[in-house]
Amino acid sequence: YYFLNNANIWLWTLYGNEKTRGFDALETNKKVPEFGGRIQYPTKKGEIALSYHHRSASSTSIEFIPQFEKIPEHRFGLDGKWDVEVGLWFETALIYKTKDLGFLTHQAFFNIGMDYTFGIGNGMNVILEHLTVALDNRFLGMENTSNVTAAMASYPLSFFDNISGVFLYNWTAGNFTFNINYNHQFEKISAYLMVYYNPSAVSGIQQNDLVNQFSGSGIRLMIVYNH
């Protein structure tokens, strides 16, 4: 629902989900509905929002932690973004479980980012983000933490050609990941040429759709037909 000042409220419910999503530590019990809501409020040159989500998790697929089919889980999120001289945003998420699962009991995520388009040639867009992830058996505990800094740059060479790069550094593991991508748009075909490097052991934070999960360095060619 949208108010006249552009504030809005979202409510949702989900059912039948089982697999992990994003940074989920545990799978979802698909027999128990999920539900949540979000309140978003406009601020000067931006907006801020508060979110809540509830689900029942299941630890039966992980052998080294206590086994529970139904683990009530409460998720709290706070995020905001502003357009000033640069684009600025932050995202925080706190996950509280009612069962003791050791270091997987509670999670905390803190992310800050910024983006800016430089007036170079056709315009080069640069995005910087830093993410801290904490796992602990104490709520808001920071004993087991991981820190990753990411940068993404994109430059349009022409209307049909673009070059971009994704770079990640894991401060905890001390390793570096990158993926440089050139793509050309034909009438019905999109062609991608990718050069990448991944460390031999890639953490879950560094695994995503933008950075492939093959270890080592390599070149990949991908052709996509659009119909």
Predicted regions, residues:
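Outer-membrane beta-barrel "beta-signal"
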Residues: 41, 184-190, 213-227
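Low-complexity, intrinsically disordered Gly/Pro/Thr-rich segments
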Residues: 196, 201-211, 217-220
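C-terminal structural cap/anchor segments
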Residues: 119-183
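Signature for the C-terminal beta-barrel architecture of outer-membrane proteins
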Residues: 1-141
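Short active-site-adjacent structural elements
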Residues: 19-20, 59, 173-177, 200-204
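Hydrophobic, lipid-facing positions within transmembrane beta-strands of outer-membrane proteins
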Residues: 33-37, 74-78, 86, 108-113, ...
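Membrane-embedded beta-strand positions of outer-membrane beta-barrel proteins
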Residues: 11, 39, 50, 90-92, ...
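C-terminal closing repeat unit and adjoining cap/tail of repeat-based domains
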Residues: 182-202
